[in-house]
Amino acid sequence: MRLNQVTVGATNFQESLAFYLKVGLRLIVSARDEYARFELPDGEATLSIHLQTTVPQGGPIIYFEVDDVDSTAARLRSKGIAFTEGPTDQPWLWREARLSDPAGNEICLFKAGENRRYPPWRLGPTAT
């Protein structure tokens, strides 16, 4: 099993579309100004936006792993994207920067290296 796609709400479709293009995602599907699907630059995963009247706050966080959090954040800031936090080193051994899309969906740019899947506190192979 693989995670292929995540869909998040967009309260202003055109604004959200422009935002994710600025972030660097590639538009692969767009339908009736209410649904769009993007392909990430690396890997096979996709992210979709779907027009909604409201988007619940405190929902899932979208994590994009990048090679260099600081340079990626600087590049996005130069395009007018504001960050709410970071880049900062976290106690769980990741470097992170956080931002929100126009609908308020939280996004975390991070670099974790081996600690993403194999942190020092990872459970053994028999854990369920």
PLM features: residue spans?
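Vicinal oxygen chelate
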Residues: 2-11, 38-39, 52-128
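Core segments of cupin and vicinal oxygen chelate
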Residues: 7-46
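Short, charged/polar, Gly/Pro-enriched secondary-structure boundary elements
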Residues: 43-48, 104-107
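Acetyl-CoA-dependent GNAT
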Residues: 29-31, 50-53, 111-115
